């Protein structure tokens, strides 16, 4: 009886290759737009005047891929708004990254080993279409709002003085395209580093055993923090009310807060400052620390958060337990031939890279101010400005100075993460060795087929 043939996919044709790349790009943008739209709707942005919601949605996606949005406008000849926002809504970013990775991998699902030329071709086509999409996105992320002054008398006086308040925004094209390209490359690199389904060229197959176990384990740590943060956010919405705005924070910035907690639990620090109103609820200890007196720079650390809420000390054992579990899992999925010191070093490097990326992703800068005849006025905040656009009675009342800055101290955070990773990797390897489960994995679990005796030494 004739045996059924097994389908083996070959390199895509030119048209199929471009369609595959288009599917990856469109899927990513669709996922980011859906999450951002729901989050903005919950935040109240659906009430923006002048049909500005689509442009604001495009601006949110611009920020999600690492771009920047500039605010501008003013009130005739007398006042001007000078502002800029550069902060990643990581819930939106994560949605796009996960969907793009899944679509990219599904196109390679019949591969055991992929040729280097084919993978580079797929990546190059995706990059080209991604850059085109980013350029179009920057065109859509611009809008100007004409803000009413209020009653008839205010309108009359404003017209006589030449006060025609307008507040607009536009995406910064160079940063959006440049950083957006880097964002895509990081997503694709992470996909190949984490997923066992991602085929590699034969020359790179030996290296996957050194990278994938640790990368996958730390990815699970980040996901665990998201689950914990989601549970805490939902509980807060139920107990303390304000459910709509709390859910908006979860849909826009859950990873920003959860992964910040991960870094703080490891001993990392962030420097920041907050003046004015945020507009959306954030954990009270974080907001209190950022509101340093006299506008001074604040330090976000385990100690400063615990000064506001003693429960913050739980971030330390939480980070220790999850990192130790990740070290065990990485060793459990590694080959028997990997020595303890090798596993510890690999896990230390992976931990350092993870915290480096978390630090870069959680940076935030949002500054604006209204000047009248060159002199800054007002004590409002960024939340007041946004609130006025969402229906406030007197928009000019909120056009004061406001800022939010958040920057990681990477020169201490990265070495700390490496030290934690070294310890967790070594202890994890010892625990895995006691289980007797480190070692052989069947060849079907690893792209590349059989190796000596039908088995290969473990896989990530």
Task: Name each model feature, range by range.
Residues 26-34, 126-138, 217-233, 353-354, ...:
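Selective recognition of specific alpha-helical transmembrane segments in multi-pass small-molecule
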Residues 169-185:
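Alpha-helical transmembrane segments
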Residues 3-19, 97-124, 138-146, 185-217, ...:
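Cytoplasmic membrane-interface segments at the C-terminal ends of transmembrane helices
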Residues 445-460:
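Long, low-complexity, intrinsically disordered cytosolic termini of multi-pass membrane proteins
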Residues 201-245:
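Loop-centered beta-sheet repeat module
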Residues 4-95, 139-173, 233-319, 357-444, ...:
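Long, glycine/tryptophan/cysteine-rich extracytoplasmic
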């Amino acid at each position: 009886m004739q045996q059924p043939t097994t389908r083996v996919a070959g390199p895509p044709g030119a048209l199929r290759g471009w369609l595959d790349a288009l599917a990856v790009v469109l899927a990513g943008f669709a996922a980011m737009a859906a999450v951002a739209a729901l989050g903005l709707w919950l935040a109240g942005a659906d009430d923006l005047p002048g049909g500005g919601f689509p442009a604001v949605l495009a601006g949110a996606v611009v920020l999600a891929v690492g771009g920047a949005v500039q605010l501008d406008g003013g009130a005739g000849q007398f006042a001007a708004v000078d502002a800029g926002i550069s902060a990643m809504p990581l819930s939106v970013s994560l949605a796009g990254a996960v969907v793009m990775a899944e679509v990219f991998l599904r196109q390679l699902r019949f591969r055991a080993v992929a040729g280097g030329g084919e993978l580079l071709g797929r990546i190059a086509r995706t990059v080209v279409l991604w850059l085109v999409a980013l350029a179009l996105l920057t065109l859509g992320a611009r809008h100007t709002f004409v803000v009413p002054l209020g009653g008839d008398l205010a309108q009359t006086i404003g017209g006589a003085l030449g006060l025609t308040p307008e507040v607009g925004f536009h995406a910064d094209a160079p940063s959006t395209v440049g950083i957006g390209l880097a964002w895509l490359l990081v997503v694709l690199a992470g996909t190949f580093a984490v997923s066992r389904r991602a085929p590699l060229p034969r020359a790179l197959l030996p290296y996957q055993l050194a990278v994938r176990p640790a990368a996958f384990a730390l990815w699970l740590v980040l996901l665990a923090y998201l689950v914990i943060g989601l549970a805490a956010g939902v509980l807060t919405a139920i107990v303390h009310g304000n459910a709509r705005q709390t859910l908006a924070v979860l849909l826009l910035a859950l990873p920003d807060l959860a992964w910040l907690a991960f870094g703080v639990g490891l001993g990392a620090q962030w420097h920041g400052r907050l003046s004015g109103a945020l507009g959306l609820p954030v954990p009270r200890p974080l907001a209190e620390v950022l509101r340093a007196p006299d506008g001074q720079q604040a330090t976000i650390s385990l100690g400063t958060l615990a000064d506001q809420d003693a429960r913050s000390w739980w971030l330390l054992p939480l980070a220790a337990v999850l990192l130790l579990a990740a070290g065990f899992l990485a060793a459990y999925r590694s080959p028997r031939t990997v020595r303890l010191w090798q596993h510890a070093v690999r896990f230390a490097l992976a931990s350092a890279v993870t915290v480096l990326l978390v630090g870069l992703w959680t940076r935030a800068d949002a500054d604006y101010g209204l000047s009248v005849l060159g002199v800054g006025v007002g004590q409002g905040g960024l939340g007041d400005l946004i609130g006025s656009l969402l229906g406030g009675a007197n928009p000019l009342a909120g056009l004061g100075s406001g800022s939010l800055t958040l920057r990681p101290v990477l020169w201490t955070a990265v070495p700390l993460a490496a030290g934690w990773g070294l310890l967790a990797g070594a202890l994890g390897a010892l625990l895995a060795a006691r289980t007797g489960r480190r070692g052989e994995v069947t060849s079907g679990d690893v792209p590349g087929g059989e190796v000596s005796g039908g088995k290969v030494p473990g896989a990530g």
